[in-house]
Amino acid sequence: MSLTYMNMFMAFTISLLGLLLYRSHMMSSLLCLEGMMLSLFVMMTMIILNTHLTLASMIPIILLVFAACEAALGLSLLVMVSTTYGMDYVQNLNLLQC
């Protein structure tokens, strides 16, 4: 396993650990999710380029589309919660029920 793959795997695990440990604020959770998606994108792109899989070259772009949709939904939820309650705690999401 090369050093670049190990760095991307470490970035993914650190983002996952940050998501598990700092889950009280929504902004930190969203940043950790974006770090996980970015490291997955880079790892998938490197694997596809190194193995010369031309048929799977569309998969990282599809992952980026899902990451952009996740970021847009997360930011809209963050804006809605912060304008309604004045803080971005994840525990306030239980109060959004109809």
UniProtKB/Swiss-Prot annotation:
Protein function: Core subunit of the mitochondrial membrane respiratory chain NADH dehydrogenase (Complex I) which catalyzes electron transfer from NADH through the respiratory chain, using ubiquinone as an electron acceptor. Part of the enzyme membrane arm which is embedded in the lipid bilayer and involved in proton translocation.
Topology in the membrane?
A: Multi-pass membrane protein
Q: Which InterPro entries match?
A: NADH_UbQ_OxRdtase_chain4L/K, NUOK/Mnh_C1-like
Q: Could you tell me the EC number(s) of this protein?
A: 7.1.1.2
Task: Report the transmembrane regions from the record.
Answer: 1-21, 29-49, 61-81
UniProt-recorded name of the protein: NADH-ubiquinone oxidoreductase chain 4L
**Where is it localised?**
Mitochondrion inner membrane
Self-association or partners: how does it assemble? Core subunit of respiratory chain NADH dehydrogenase (Complex I) which is composed of 45 different subunits.
Q: Name one GO molecular function term.
A: NADH dehydrogenase (ubiquinone) activity
Question: What catalytic activity does the UniProt entry give for this protein?
Answer: a ubiquinone + NADH + 5 H(+)(in) = a ubiquinol + NAD(+) + 4 H(+)(out)
Give the protein family.
Belongs to the complex I subunit 4L family.
Q: Which PANTHER family match?
A: NADH-UBIQUINONE OXIDOREDUCTASE CHAIN 4L (PTHR11434:SF0), NADH-UBIQUINONE OXIDOREDUCTASE SUBUNIT ND4L (PTHR11434)
Q: Which gene encodes it?
A: MT-ND4L
